[in-house]
Amino acid sequence: MLKAEHITKQYQIPGGRHTVFDAVSDVSIELGNGGVTAIVGESGSGKSTLARVLSYVERPDGGRVFLDGLEVSVCGRRELRAVRGKVQLVMQNALGSLDPHQNVASILEEPLRLLFHMGAEKRKQRCLELLDMARLERDTLRHRPGELSGGQQKRLCIARALAAQPQHIIFDESFSGLDVTLKKQVLDFLKELQTQLQISFLVITHDLDTAMYMADAIHVMRRGKIIETLEHPRSFSDFQEPYSQELVKAVRSKRRALQ
């Protein structure tokens, strides 16, 4: 279980001496082992900052983060190394998060070598299994990221995350920039993958439509705070907060534009 209690994360305002703002303010969230949770909000709402705190990329300025009872928000490097693979972060810019000089085989082998100390033959076999899981052709191994399509790059990032055998995967705006057809293909693939592996997914998105399609629970975030939480929402009419209703209007406007 991944659990955050009263998380606050502050940043200094550029050009403002000794002036800080709360990117995340007193946020608590709990992710069980399995299921899909979504955090939805506009750009600047603090959701990506929260994702970085939950994945130990950044330490909170206040509050605590626990993974299976271990307070990872105060762990040193050695302790973090032991749990590093348990929470994986898949970023928005797939190509930017992949080493352009490595081929796919090297990208997938790295976590297998560092986290599990696998020998060469076992790494090779596991890479093939990961490609199959991500629905990538096996000859992809010899290619570099820049030679892959946008959809293939997304799937490669997912395969790399799976290589760590995580309990939780956080998708930070990972589906932005995909056209409607490709986006649905990726989302359907992830839903099937989550059901198969029973990994906990946290979907960070500005798109309430994506959150409704994917998630069992939705947290609406605004100005660093979670302002509304719905468990198993059935329709957009379940959202009550005025800001949440603005997000609903944005979805409906987008749908009309696509008709």
Predicted regions: what is each one?
Residues 16-18, 72-88, 106, 114, ...:
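ABC ATPase NBD coupling module
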Residues 55:
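Helix-to-loop junction immediately C-terminal to a conserved catalytic motif
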Residues 63-71, 228:
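Conserved ABC transporter NBD signature motif
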Residues 122-139, 248-249:
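Conserved ABC ATPase "signature" region
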Residues 144-148, 152:
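Conserved ABC ATPase signature
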Residues 211-213:
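A short, surface-exposed alpha-helical micro-motif characterized by mixed small hydrophobic
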Residues 237-259:
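C-terminal boundary and immediately downstream tail of ABC-type ATPase nucleotide-binding domains
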